[in-house]
């Protein structure tokens, strides 16, 4: 997910995306622990998405952009 795409979303949509990303990360970690995860690059991708979402939320909180 691109940061400009996230910036175009409303606050409620961003919160929903964050919730979905946390759920996806949980499921990926569960698959990793049971050795069912095929693509290991999914974990860092989801973590980066969460970081981008939190960055945009913080920008809005501080009214930077």
From Swiss-Prot:
<dbReference type="InterPro" id="IPR036049">
    <property type="entry name" value="Ribosomal_uL29_sf"/>
</dbReference>
<dbReference type="Pfam" id="PF00831">
    <property type="entry name" value="Ribosomal_L29"/>
</dbReference>
<dbReference type="GO" id="GO:0006412">
    <property type="term" value="P:translation"/>
</dbReference>
<dbReference type="GO" id="GO:0003735">
    <property type="term" value="F:structural constituent of ribosome"/>
</dbReference>
<protein>
    <recommendedName>
        <fullName>Large ribosomal subunit protein uL29</fullName>
    </recommendedName>
</protein>
<dbReference type="GO" id="GO:0022625">
    <property type="term" value="C:cytosolic large ribosomal subunit"/>
</dbReference>
<keyword id="KW-0689">Ribosomal protein</keyword>
<keyword id="KW-0687">Ribonucleoprotein</keyword>
<comment type="similarity">
    <text>Belongs to the universal ribosomal protein uL29 family.</text>
</comment>
<dbReference type="InterPro" id="IPR001854">
    <property type="entry name" value="Ribosomal_uL29"/>
</dbReference>
<dbReference type="InterPro" id="IPR050063">
    <property type="entry name" value="Ribosomal_protein_uL29"/>
</dbReference>
